[in-house]
């Protein structure tokens, strides 16, 4: 706690300035309010007589990028106070129509995020952008800021300060597996425990002391009984499973086995862990009943069970499609997965969704297992990060590569955007390519290829039946969301352009390559791909990335309106506004 206090004492004011700037900028982008231009920059006038003034520049997305150090607050009645994120939220509460009970919950997320921000800034004191850029991927992401769009991106509601020190990515604390076995008998009706898996030559953990559990994989069939080894974070056992699965524990269906095996490090997503004992071993993705950003971080059973089949199919696509082979893109497969529902909650379909997502496990190939000689992996999110002095990591990669900015970015767009767009146009499949889902493989510090992952809920299919999907198993089609062409295109536009490139292009602009140049280059690479594959022209027209107006997707305001604790489903984003397409604006700027 002493270190936490030191971080708060040193960085509290700076963290609040940055948070206020992000709140004002993102909320205005989501159309919560509009700024008024002034001679010095911009101002926001609120109904309570309060005025926020600041300097900033409007980017190509129509969003004002605010200088946090320039923000001042002026009140009609009370004396001016230091810049405070909590105070800003109180000023905005009437405008956001947020009742006190909801406000209190989000205030908890705000305070936890500010604490996390202060600790990160303290941790980043001793590291430069150059040093951070060269760290291994698993260690590097423990320095990252988190979700770029959600203003309260380290809420982790449910964790206390001790939990943060043990489980938060920025704590960079490794831990052992925590395991249990779940036993169920087959019955004629669908069982509450299901598994999907295939045997592997290596067990995913070190042998346990008991010889019975030397091989810990799934499924292991014993007559009419199936025994599945589950992994989970110790917090999940202590705070959820040991209480909510008490019936299964009492009847010896669920048996706690304790901590053992390899050491794992939490990734930026909290619920995915990397094997640091054997980096080429499997990552594991686990349900975690902690509220962070938009939802509780459980995993729906239907997605867990469909994941291995979906990843098999996507992998076959990438191994057989000539363009994807040429791009050397690969899939991080999910060779096995398991899910167990608690018997009583399974009978309550309208219960809050977090009670249906308590116990499961997904084994996923690690990025390290796919790398060739001379390659290294980073998350796409790394390109959005800067050090404490504001030096972007992307600048370090470009400089180390010896390439021009334009050449480096051309390689980036060819390696990342083209495979995702090709997958959509040729197969009617979208994968949400946000900064955590895209693993970028570098060679000589330049973009070379991508590794794709996450097929539980972040994969969608076009509404109409495409013949290219004929070989996709019905079990996957049944649980996968389908969207018409004019909506599914926004998985690329919003999932990648808005959520990732929107935060990279301003950093590149600082390096002398303007945002119009950035998006014009992206458009040029897309047009080059389209010109080389005219056989897909009808699909290109259906999935048109160059329409003048595109959907504006809002997350923060939607979260404030959603009753997460009581809801049987996750929040849905706002999709009721349009914005000018940067790809089109960049072409107009050229003219």
From Swiss-Prot:
GO terms for molecular function: aerobactin synthase activity; ATP binding; transferase activity. It catalyses: N(2)-citryl-N(6)-acetyl-N(6)-hydroxy-L-lysine + N(6)-acetyl-N(6)-hydroxy-L-lysine + ATP = aerobactin + AMP + diphosphate + H(+). GO terms for biological process: aerobactin biosynthetic process; siderophore biosynthetic process. Coiled coil: none annotated. Pathway: Siderophore biosynthesis; aerobactin biosynthesis. Its EC number is 6.3.2.39. Keywords: ATP-binding, Ligase, Nucleotide-binding, Transferase. The keyword Protein transport does not apply. InterPro entries: Aerobactin_biosyn_IucA/IucC_N, IucA/IucC-like_C, LucA/IucC-like. The keyword Phosphoprotein does not apply. Belongs to the IucA/IucC family. Catalyzes the attachment of the second N-acetyl-N-hydroxylysine to the carboxylic group of N-citryl-N-acetyl-N-hydroxylysine to yield aerobactin. Involved in the biosynthesis of the siderophore aerobactin which is a chelator that mediates the high-affinity iron transport systems induced under iron-stressed conditions. This is Aerobactin synthase. It comes from Vibrio mimicus.
């Amino acid at each position: 706690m002493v270190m936490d206090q030191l971080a708060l004492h040193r960085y509290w004011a700076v963290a609040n300035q940055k948070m206020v700037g992000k709140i004002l900028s993102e909320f205005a982008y989501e159309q919560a309010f509009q700024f008024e231009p002034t001679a010095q920059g911009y101002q926001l006038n609120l109904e309570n007589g309060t005025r926020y003034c600041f300097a900033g520049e409007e980017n190509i997305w129509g969003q004002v990028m605010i200088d946090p150090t320039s923000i001042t607050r002026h009140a009609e009645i009370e004396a001016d106070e230091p810049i405070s994120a909590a105070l800003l939220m109180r000023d905005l509460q009437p405008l956001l129509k947020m009742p006190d009970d909801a406000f209190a919950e989000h205030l908890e997320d705000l305070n936890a995020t500010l604490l996390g921000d202060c600790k990160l800034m303290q941790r980043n004191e001793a590291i430069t952008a150059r040093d951070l850029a060269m760290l291994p991927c698993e260690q590097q992401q423990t320095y990252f800021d988190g979700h770029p769009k959600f203003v309260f991106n380290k809420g982790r509601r449910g964790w206390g300060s001790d939990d943060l020190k043990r489980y938060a990515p920025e704590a960079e604390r490794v831990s052992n597996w925590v395991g249990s076995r779940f036993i169920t008998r087959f019955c004629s009706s669908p069982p509450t425990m299901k598994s999907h898996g295939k045997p592997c030559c290596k067990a995913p953990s070190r042998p346990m002391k008991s010889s019975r559990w030397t091989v810990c994989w799934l499924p292991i069939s014993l007559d009419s009984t199936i025994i599945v080894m589950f992994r989970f974070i110790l917090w999940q056992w202590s705070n959820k499973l040991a209480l909510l699965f008490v019936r299964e524990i009492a009847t010896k269906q669920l048996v706690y086995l304790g901590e053992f095996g390899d050491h794992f490090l939490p990734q930026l997503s909290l619920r995915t862990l990397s094997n640091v004992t054997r980096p080429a071993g499997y990552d594991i993705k686990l349900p975690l009943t902690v509220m962070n950003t938009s939802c509780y971080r459980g995993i729906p059973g239907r997605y867990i069970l469909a994941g291995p089949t979906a990843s098999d199919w996507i992998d076959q696509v990438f191994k057989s499609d000539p363009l994807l082979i040429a791009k050397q893109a690969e899939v991080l497969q999910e060779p096995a997965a398991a899910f167990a529902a608690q018997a009583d909650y399974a009978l309550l379909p309208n219960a809050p969704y977090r009670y249906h997502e308590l116990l499961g496990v997904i084994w996923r190939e690690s990025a390290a297992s796919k790398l060739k000689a001379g390659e290294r992996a980073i998350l796409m999110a790394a390109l959005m990060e800067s050090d404490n002095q504001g030096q972007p990591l992307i600048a370090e990669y470009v400089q180390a590569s010896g390439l021009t900015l334009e050449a480096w970015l051309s390689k980036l767009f060819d390696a990342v955007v083209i495979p995702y767009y090709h997958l959509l146009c040729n197969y009617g499949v979208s994968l949400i390519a946000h900064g955590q889902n895209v693993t970028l493989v570098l060679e000589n510090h330049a973009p070379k290829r991508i590794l794709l992952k996450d097929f539980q809920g972040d994969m969608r299919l076009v509404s109409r039946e495409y013949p290219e999907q004929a070989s996709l198993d019905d079990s996957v089609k049944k649980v996968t969301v389908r969207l018409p062409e004019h909506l599914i295109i926004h998985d690329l536009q919003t999932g990648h352009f808005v959520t990732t490139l929107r935060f990279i292009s301003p950093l590149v602009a600082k390096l002398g390559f303007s945002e119009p140049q950035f998006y014009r280059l992206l458009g040029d690479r897309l047009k080059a791909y389209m010109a080389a594959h005219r056989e897909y022209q009808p699909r290109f027209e259906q999935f048109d990335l160059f329409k003048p107006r595109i959907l504006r997707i809002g997350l923060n305001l939607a979260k404030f309106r959603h009753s997460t604790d009581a809801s049987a489903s996750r929040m849905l984003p706002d999709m009721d506004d349009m914005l000018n397409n940067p790809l089109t604006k960049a072409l107009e700027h050229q003219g």
